[in-house]
Amino acid sequence: MSEIASRVKAIIVDKLGVEESEVTNEASFTNDLGADSLDTVELIMEFEKEFGISIPDDQAEKIGTVGDAVSYIEEHAK
């Protein structure tokens, strides 16, 4: 697992209060991890802060799974 993936998963565990074992690349923030729309906005904001990136709203809407988040951040992180 990449450093970015590890950091993304740690943020999700912290923010959503889920078990690390639940946070798989295929896990949907809403369907599998119980996040609501506010939770997902907060996750995106935390990813932006942690990785020093900006995620436009139109891109944030496409980030629905843990794997989506990791892929986006790996592409855009400095």
From Swiss-Prot:
One of its GO terms (cellular component) is cytosol. 4'-phosphopantetheine is transferred from CoA to a specific serine of apo-ACP by AcpS. This modification is essential for activity because fatty acids are bound in thioester linkage to the sulfhydryl of the prosthetic group. Disulfide bonds: none annotated. Pathway: Lipid metabolism; fatty acid biosynthesis. Keywords: Cytoplasm, Fatty acid biosynthesis, Fatty acid metabolism, Lipid biosynthesis, Lipid metabolism, Phosphopantetheine, Phosphoprotein. The keyword Nucleotide-binding does not apply. It is found in: Cytoplasm. InterPro entries: ACP (IPR003231), ACP-like_sf (IPR036736), PKS_PP-bd (IPR020806), PP-bd_ACP (IPR009081), Ppantetheine_attach_site (IPR006162). GO terms for molecular function: acyl binding; acyl carrier activity; phosphopantetheine binding. GO terms for biological process: lipid A biosynthetic process. The modification O-(pantetheine 4'-phosphoryl)serine is found at residue 37. Carrier of the growing fatty acid chain in fatty acid biosynthesis. HAMAP family: Acyl_carrier. Belongs to the acyl carrier protein (ACP) family. This is Acyl carrier protein. The lineage of its organism: Bacteria, Pseudomonadati, Bacteroidota, Bacteroidia, Bacteroidales.
